C-alpha cells in the first residue's frame, strides 16, 4: 500500500500527537468552561449532552487515530505486541464512542428532543456500526482464532482500506456535529463572533488537521527507501 509519497511517517505521527493534545484540551475547555461541565445525571440536561462531544472526540476520534498509528509509532517493536495494542485501542475507541452516543440519546430522551432526525445522527449510527464490524472482523482474522496466512494476506489490504474509510467518515461526521451544535447555539443567541464560537470552529479545524496527519502517517513509509510493494502494516 506504499504510495510513494516521498515523505516519512514520523513527522506526521508527531504532528498528530500534538494536535490530539490540543483538540482534547479545546473540547474540554468548551464543555467545562463554556457549557457548564459534564454530568451523568443532572436537572440541567445540557450537562448530560456535554459528555457526548468529549467522549466522541477524545475516545472515538483521538484514541481511534492513535490505534491506526500504532504500527507507525512503534515500527521496531514486536509485531504481536503492536497488534494487541492496535486491537485494544480500537476496542476502547469503539466502547467510548458507543457510550458517547448513548449520552446523546439520554439527553434527547430526557429533554423531549426527537432522536435520529439529522444527517449527523444517521451517519453517526452507521459509522459506529461499521467500526464495530471492522473490529470484529479484524479480531477474528488477525487475532483469535486467526485466519490462515494466505487469507490474512488477502484480507489485509481491504482491512486497511476499509478502516481508513470508516475513520475518515467518523472525522467528517465529527465536523457535522460541531457545525450542528454551533448552529443550534447561535440560533439560540450565541454571539457568532464570540469566543465560544471561535473555539468551536478552531477545535473543528484542529480535528481536521489531526485526522489528515493520522491518514498520511498510516500510508507513508517508515523509511523513504522502502522497496516497491511495501505494506505499511505488517501482514502477519
From Swiss-Prot:
UniProt-annotated binding residues for monodehydro-L-ascorbate radical: 116-125
Gene Ontology terms for molecular function: metal ion binding; oxidoreductase activity
Subcellular location, record wording: Membrane
Binding residues annotated for L-ascorbate, in chain numbering: 67-75
Domain of life: Eukaryota
Cytoplasmic compartment spans: 1-13, 72-84, 144-153, 223-236
Top-level EC class: oxidoreductase
PROSITE patterns: CYTOCHROME_B561
Topology class, membrane: Multi-pass membrane protein
SMART domains, sorted: B561
Ranges for domain Cytochrome b561: 15-219
GO cellular component: membrane
Co-factor remark: Binds 2 heme b groups non-covalently.
Entry keywords, A to Z: Electron transport, Heme, Iron, Membrane, Metal-binding, Oxidoreductase, Transmembrane, Transmembrane helix, Transport
Protein name, as recorded: Ascorbate-specific transmembrane electron transporter 2
Biological source species: Zea mays
